[in-house]
């Protein structure tokens, strides 16, 4: 048996942990630059605020209904996610972190399924303040189905689907578009052929499914029938590339501002590489103007820079990124977005050094480790490269950002005795 734990309205729940007066009031969380709605509390959903809604179009709705609006605080959400996963790991020996707010758990050795799920749910709520729902079933896909119903239709937030008749009933009521991995395109394709529910899907000939939905679709159908095709993967596969990109908070024209932004993004990529114990051999940079503003000159370009030796050193990766930027920057244009991608990633212990390497890698490794330690303890970018800048006018617009309660010393809550 496999269980899926899914945090309820995760971003909104994170905001409530340190602001308990937000319980039972409508909350929305906005995307980068406070553009669109990317998370909603149940109260906001009842007001008819859809996912992806442009924030400016719903300002009157927010004001009229006293909706609390937050800029996305990914530092807070990421840290609370780690705390949720750490708490669950103390109860479950074998688990797979599927996303920032989802984790699959191996329940094959659990005898009292519902009781164990309720125990995990209660512990996560007590230790982290985050509410979760848990669905338990024979396969990952069915666990997703069970979680869907646990979240929407049960008071306890826990549902076990292990009875064939109960599974069939659940699939008959489940819209095919709600299935794991079935996006809008496939949902529309299936609906046009009269396949409306998950139960309709599993009644199709498997050869037709494979032909029209690839082998991934076939495995989904087999999972819904109770045959396990996707095992628990305790260790996430190493990334093939890492990208850091952002839309700018205002119009950017100057090379200096672009250089600061690209240096900051390259530094973030380097930190992620070190966190994985990996190194990259290629650094790519891209720039784009605003594709939705046709009154301005349109431009999009990228440049790939090959490193002589794979590295995770911020100094080397930033240098390569700036080299790439200088090759694609055009004066006079208004830029909306930039990004850095590191690729050709290899494990750090498999890097082949050069006899003529001029870099003292042991000293650089110590330096990067020291910088990471300080920034982890004191807050992001407390120690940074000068080229990253300090004014940073290009940064994201975050007018509704909550404090980083768990990752920044200056934002720690204080208690008066």
Model feature map: region roles:
Residues 322-377:
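C-terminal hydrophobic structural anchor segments
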Residues 103-108, 302-308, 351-357:
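Short, hydrophobic beta-strand segments
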Residues 10, 33-36, 290-293, 345-349:
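Short, charged/polar surface micro-motifs in flexible loops or helix N-caps
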Residues 1-222, 361-417:
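Gly/Gly-Pro- and Ser/Thr-rich, intrinsically disordered tail segments characteristic of DNA damage-repair
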Residues 111-115, 294, 346-353:
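Short, charged/polar, Gly/Pro-enriched secondary-structure boundary elements
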Residues 136-140, 287-289, 339-344, 387-389:
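A general secondary-structure junction signal
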Residues 98-102, 137-140, 278-282, 333-337:
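Short Gly/Ser/Thr- and Asp/Glu-enriched loop/turn motifs at secondary-structure junctions
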Residues 46, 186, 191-334, 350:
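DNA-contacting surface of Y-family translesion DNA polymerases
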């Amino acid at each position: 048996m496999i269980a899926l734990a899914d945090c309820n309205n995760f971003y909104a729940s994170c905001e409530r942990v340190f602001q308990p007066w937000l319980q039972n009031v409508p909350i929305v969380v906005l995307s980068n630059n406070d553009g669109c709605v990317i998370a909603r509390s149940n109260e906001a959903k009842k007001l008819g605020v859809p996912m992806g809604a442009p924030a400016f179009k719903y300002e009157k709705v927010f004001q009229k209904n006293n909706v609390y609006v937050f800029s996305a605080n990914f530092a807070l959400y990421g840290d609370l996610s780690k705390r949720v996963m750490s708490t669950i790991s103390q109860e479950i020996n074998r688990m797979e972190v599927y996303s920032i707010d989802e984790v699959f758990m191996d329940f094959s050795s659990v005898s009292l399924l519902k009781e164990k799920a309720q125990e995990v749910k209660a512990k996560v709520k007590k230790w982290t303040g985050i509410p979760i729902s848990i669905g338990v079933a024979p396969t990952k896909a069915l666990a997703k189905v069970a979680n869907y119903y646990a979240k929407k239709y049960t008071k306890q937030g826990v549902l076990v689907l292990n009875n064939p008749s109960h599974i069939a009933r659940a699939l008959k009521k489940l819209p095919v578009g709600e299935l794991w991995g079935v996006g809008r395109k496939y949902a529309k394709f299936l609906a046009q052929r009269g396949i409306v529910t998950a139960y309709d899907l599993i009644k199709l000939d498997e050869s037709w499914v494979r032909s029209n939905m690839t082998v991934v679709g076939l495995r989904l159908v087999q999972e819904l029938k109770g045959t396990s095709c996707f095992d628990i993967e305790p260790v996430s596969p190493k990334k093939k590339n890492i990208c850091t990109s952002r839309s700018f908070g205002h119009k950017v024209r100057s090379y200096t501002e672009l250089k600061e932004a690209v240096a900051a993004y390259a530094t973030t990529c380097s930190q992620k590489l070190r966190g994985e114990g990996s190194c990259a051999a290629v650094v790519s940079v891209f720039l784009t103007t605003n594709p939705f503003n046709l009154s301005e000159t349109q431009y999009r370009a990228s440049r790939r820079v090959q490193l002589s030796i794979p590295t995770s050193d911020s100094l080397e990766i930033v240098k390569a990124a700036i080299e790439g930027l200088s090759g694609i920057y055009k004066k006079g244009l208004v830029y909306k977005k930039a990004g850095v991608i590191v690729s050709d990633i290899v494990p750090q212990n498999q890097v082949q050094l050069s006899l003529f390497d001029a870099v003292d890698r042991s000293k650089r490794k110590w330096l990067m480790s020291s910088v990471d330690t300080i920034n982890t303890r004191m807050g992001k970018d407390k120690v940074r490269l000068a080229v990253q800048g300090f004014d940073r006018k290009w940064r994201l617009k975050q007018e509704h950002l909550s404090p980083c309660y768990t990752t920044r010393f200056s934002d720690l809550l204080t208690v008066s005795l």
